[in-house]
A protein has these predicted regions:
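An extracytoplasmic/periplasmic, membrane-proximal ligand-sensing/linker region
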Residues: 101, 161, 186-248
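Short helices/loops that flank or line small-molecule/ion binding pockets
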Residues: 1-6, 93-94, 98, 112-122, ...
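Non-transmembrane alpha-helical segments in soluble domains
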Residues: 2, 64-67, 115, 119, ...
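Short beta-strand and adjacent tight-turn residues that come in two discontinuous sequence segments
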Residues: 11-14, 42, 108, 127-129, ...
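Alpha-to-beta junction loops
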Residues: 3-13, 73-77, 99-101, 119-126, ...
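A ligand-binding cleft/hinge motif common to bilobed small-molecule-binding domains
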Residues: 17-28, 94-98, 125-159, 236
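Hinge/capping helix and adjacent helix->loop/strand transition within the periplasmic-binding protein
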Residues: 3-9, 24-113, 162-164, 175-208
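Conserved functional loop/turn residues at catalytic and ligand-binding sites
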Residues: 5, 15, 107, 121-122, ...
Length: 248
């Protein structure tokens, strides 16, 4: 998209991590999140979830109880995610550190293999997109111990947030945003914004995204720019504290 003609015909839909996290995990990115892209509108948001499988006893029903189980079983103190260097990776480790538990992160190439190992009992827990867990919860195959948003998700109102369970600093929601090539004229950006916001307001779009655990959320270009800066400013110190680099 950064090389596309800045006429509104090319629009990028990307998760926050590509713009707010990867600049800190990769020493050399082929793009500049600010200079190469023009914010158009937010698209959707979703929370993360912490799920456990059959390796964790049924008596464990909360994150504090999971941390106590890890302490009693240090050889099993593992947590997985779909990718190294992702927000999911960091949230899991921060959760352990806040509880005084040194968790080992196991990165998978995508969520499906991570879920398979959790269901098979070789991996105790997984930090993943909340929507990924919804069908598995309905089938009784996993237990969701926490969600990561500021409030309980409407998709899992019975599941307490991390903040409710004592992890006040672990309030995170991922977002998707629409971006045009950098340098796109403001009138063109606004036309794209109006079209996208109208599309996102359609009931079939709202319902379709809800199936995946996504909440529709549109915005002005400036609101998206402000959100990107806030995400960038928040994740930089987190990545530095974790000490992770994808290039190492």
């Amino acid at each position: 998209v950064k090389k596309a003609v800045a006429d509104g015909s090319s629009i990028l839909l990307t998760p926050m991590s590509m713009l707010g996290v990867y600049p800190f995990t990769y020493k050399k990115l082929p793009y500049d999140p600010v200079a190469d892209l023009a914010p158009v509108s937010m698209g959707s948001t979703f929370d993360y979830g912490i799920a456990v499988g059959p390796a964790v006893p049924e008596s464990v029903k909360s994150i504090p109880e999971l941390m106590e189980w890890y302490k009693a079983n240090p050889s099993k103190a593992n947590i997985s995610s779909s990718a190294a260097g992702s927000p999911l990776h960091f949230v899991g480790l921060m959760m352990g550190r806040a509880a005084g538990v040194e968790l080992t992160h196991v990165a998978y190439r995508g969520t499906p293999p991570a879920i398979n190992d959790m269901l098979g009992g070789s991996m105790p827990a997984l930090c993943g997109p909340l929507g990924t867990f919804l069908p598995l919860m309905g089938a009784g195959k996993i237990r969701l111990l926490a969600s990561s948003g500021a409030q309980r998700s409407r998709f899992t109102p019975h599941v307490a947030t991390l903040a409710e369970q004592g992890y006040k600093d672990l309030v995170f929601s991922e977002w998707f945003g629409f971006f045009a090539p950098g340098g796109t004229p403001a009138p063109v950006v606004m036309r794209a914004n109006e079209a996208l916001r109208a599309a996102l307001a359609q009931k079939d779009v709202i319902d379709g995204l809800a199936v995946m655990g996504l909440e529709v959320k549109s915005s002005t270009p400036q609101e998206l720019a402000t959100l990107l800066k806030a995400s960038y400013d928040r994740w930089g110190p987190i990545v530095k504290k974790i000490g992770f680099t994808a290039d190492s």
